[in-house]
Amino acid sequence: MTETKKYEILEALPTYGPMYISVTESDETFYSEGFPVRFYKSDGTDWVANFKPGWTDLKIIYELKDTANLLVIACGTCYILNPDEIKPISIFGVGYSTVLNAPDGRLILQDQTDLTIIEPDGTHWDTERISWDGLAEIKVENNLVSGLAYNPMHEVDEWIEFKYDLDTKTLTGGSYYSFENKKPWWKIW
């Protein structure tokens, strides 16, 4: 049995043939070249999408494990869509820079301050904020994401370790919650 091709990432928008379809969050007509992709429908026809890009260089497509839907990442902006449909199911993010695979089929998207988890069925959720400004050395082992969170606070300027459990959705460490709002000793109210 041969697997049917669902998409083809294009070098540029086609210069001939049917007009491409702009895919944006607000349905605006987007004429500049973004991330061009040809999709192959189940009926044998095809269409070309021009995805509005986000803020990074990450351009990739993932076939989701438990659905016919695809995850398209256009320069950091995510689009979940079915190749047979022109309108995306979901659009989110603008600054994703890295994708990691969890052992159970989940995808972990790294942003500057938090993570977004894509479940095998295409649903997604965000972690709480982990860092003030920057995540580094992210890795996944046994559904536990670990790495470093940047702390740019005055006289600190350091990277702090964190761990995030994908199953219990709990964060340990990180830089964002490392400062408590303590009352000065002289205030009694």
Please report, for each region that a protein language model flagged, where it lies by residue.
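Acidic, small-residue rich beta-repeat scaffolds with periodic aromatic anchors
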Residues: E141-W189
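Loop/turn-rich, solvent-exposed surfaces of beta-rich toroidal or solenoidal domains
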Residues: N101-I117
